[in-house]
């Protein structure tokens, strides 16, 4: 960070989440084609006062948020050595180390996308979980969304990227590694594969919270009129991995 161009400033880094009152935030976006943007969002004083007044009133008087009525569809869990669908093991292996296991789990599907083998480990984990979850399903691109979360972000690949720079210098940085130093890239790989054009969001939080993900999914499903939405936990770091994907189907009257 810097206050004046070219003048470095120290950045305070914490190992734990730090609560703080927020009046402004910066929303950034970047794309593989080099399209980058940053937007500053600020709460006006009037809104801050309104927020305080709203918190002081009865919750029943607060405006309601439209949420879709949903039912659970397919569920897929990936843990060391096994892939489960609705609690039933659909693939198992004596291999528990991630690299050989995930290759076997992918080949078991009968798929042959060579790009899969070039992905980083987090993308491979999410990609395979989505393959098992959406097998034999068919949705129009704008009828389906996906919302994922994890605790370690893309740290597994971030560390590999930093190790290359630390050992060989900046010029040795590999674009093939750097491109995966964002956790939402796994969403991109899944969306490309399954032609998903609905809501796609990746949250980074301390622990899995399926209830919060489902609540958020119900809001975006109602707003975007999605027929189905994938929610899930996709965590991988230092050889430890876990994926829990769940499909929510919209049964609101608009699809009755």
Segments from the language model and where they lie:
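Conserved "HGTGT" condensation-loop signature of ketosynthase/thiolase-family condensing enzymes
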Residues: 1-256
């Amino acid at each position: 960070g810097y206050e004046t161009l070219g003048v470095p400033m120290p950045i305070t880094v914490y190992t734990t989440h730090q609560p703080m009152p927020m009046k402004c935030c910066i929303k950034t976006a970047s794309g593989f084609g080099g399209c980058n943007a940053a937007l500053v969002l600020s709460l006006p004083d009037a809104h801050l006062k309104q927020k305080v007044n709203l918190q002081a009133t009865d919750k029943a008087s607060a405006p309601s948020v439209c949420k879709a009525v949903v039912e659970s569809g397919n569920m897929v869990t990936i843990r060391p050595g096994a892939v489960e669908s609705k609690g039933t093991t659909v693939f198992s292996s004596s291999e528990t180390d991630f690299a050989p296991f995930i290759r076997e789990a992918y080949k078991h599907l009968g798929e042959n996308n060579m790009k899969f083998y070039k992905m980083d480990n987090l993308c491979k984990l999410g990609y395979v979980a989505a393959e098992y979850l959406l097998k034999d399903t068919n949705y129009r691109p704008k009828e389906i969304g996906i919302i994922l979360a994890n605790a370690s972000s893309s740290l597994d690949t971030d560390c590999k990227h930093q190790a290359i720079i630390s050992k060989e210098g900046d010029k040795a940085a590999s674009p093939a590694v750097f491109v995966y130093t964002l956790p939402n890239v796994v969403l991109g790989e899944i969306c490309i594969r399954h032609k998903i054009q609905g809501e796609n969001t990746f949250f980074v939080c301390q622990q899995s919270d399926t209830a919060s993900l489902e609540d958020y999914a119900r809001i975006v499903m109602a707003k975007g009129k999605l027929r189905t939405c994938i929610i899930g936990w996709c965590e991988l770091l230092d050889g430890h991995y876990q994926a829990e994907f769940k499909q929510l189907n919209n049964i609101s009257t608009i699809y009755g």
